[in-house]
């Protein structure tokens, strides 16, 4: 049976702390790992891995994959798409594009899908990981810019900034939210970031290995990654990039108010967790 037929969208229980949810979560990850091994039994990534978590993006992801570089300098670039459940043909589009594909049988959330990707990156030879969205808002051809601070040894973690670059969207409320939450996050982690919610990021694999056990957010995880990395002393910088409108379809992150409340929740919960953890280590 084809992968897109086997893996249909299911809804897990709402109570994230429920034992049944945790068990289904583990089974879903085990299923995805098995799926990856069946598709790619001898997988070996290039030094640079472009990692995309995708949920029902069959209309958009093909254009992103078409523009993906295969070499940056003398470094080979591999691409891994983690399909986060869904009932469309995202997995088939990725497979047809010839990239590494891993399919979750249920929708766990972007954060959970990316954590799975981080694990696969470490296990299959990647030295640098670049995350970007499946909807066309991040330009894959800007990946050399995102890797530059890692390659020259000046940073461990790079975040793209639409405020330092160009924002081609017209949502003034979302733009104001970007500035507000960057200000809040900077106050917490003593950074000078301008676009902390941007999903276009690059990492040294050593950083991901260090912070991965401390990441718990299944969705709206971008703030959690910044706070966790900063609290553990990793060097963070930013690079100017172009932020494009979605290629097609509505955002999967919800409306501005919902997104803002969820993002604030993640900032607060992560800050409290990191603060308590630091006190206990003392």
Regions found by a protein language model. Name each.
Residues 1-46, 190, 214-282:
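Hydrophobic helical membrane-anchoring modules
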Residues 52, 76-86, 102:
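Short beta-strand/loop segment that forms part of the nucleotide-sugar
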Residues 52-66, 85:
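Active-site beta-to-alpha loop of glycosyltransferases that engages the nucleotide-sugar donor
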Residues 66-76:
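Short, acidic, metal-binding catalytic loop of nucleotide-sugar glycosyltransferases
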Residues 83-91, 136:
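A conserved acidic beta->alpha catalytic loop
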Residues 96-98, 232:
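Short, structured coil segments at secondary-structure junctions
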Residues 100, 104-123, 128, 140-219, ...:
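Acceptor/aglycone-binding surface of glycosyltransferases and processive sugar-polymer synthases
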């Amino acid at each position: 049976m084809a992968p897109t037929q086997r893996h249909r969208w299911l809804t897990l229980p709402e109570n994230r702390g429920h034992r049944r949810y945790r068990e289904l979560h583990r089974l879903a990850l085990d299923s995805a790992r098995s799926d990856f091994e069946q598709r790619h039994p001898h997988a070996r990534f290039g030094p640079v891995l472009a990692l995309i978590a995708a949920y029902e993006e069959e209309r958009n992801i093909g254009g992103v994959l078409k523009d993906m570089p295969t070499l940056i300098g003398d470094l080979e670039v591999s691409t891994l798409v983690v399909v986060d459940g869904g009932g469309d043909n995202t997995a088939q589009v990725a497979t047809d594009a010839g990239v590494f594909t891993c399919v979750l049988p249920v929708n766990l959330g972007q954060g959970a899908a990316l954590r799975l990707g981080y694990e696969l990156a470490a296990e299959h030879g990647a030295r640098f990981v670049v995350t970007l969205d499946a909807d066309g808002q991040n330009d894959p051809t800007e990946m050399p810019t995102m890797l530059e601070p890692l390659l020259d040894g000046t940073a461990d973690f790079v975040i793209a900034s639409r405020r330092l670059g160009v924002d081609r969207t017209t949502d003034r409320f979302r733009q104001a939210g970007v500035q507000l939450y960057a200000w809040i996050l900077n106050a917490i982690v003593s950074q000078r970031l301008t676009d902390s919610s941007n999903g276009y990021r690059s990492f040294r694999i050593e950083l991901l290995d260090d912070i991965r056990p401390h990441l718990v957010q299944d969705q709206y995880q971008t703030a959690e990654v910044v706070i966790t990395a900063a609290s553990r002393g990793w060097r963070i910088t930013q690079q100017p990039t172009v932020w494009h409108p979605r290629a097609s379809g509505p955002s999967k992150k919800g409306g501005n108010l919902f997104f803002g409340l969820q993002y604030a929740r993640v900032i607060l919960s992560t800050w409290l967790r990191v603060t308590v953890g630091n006190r206990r280590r003392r």
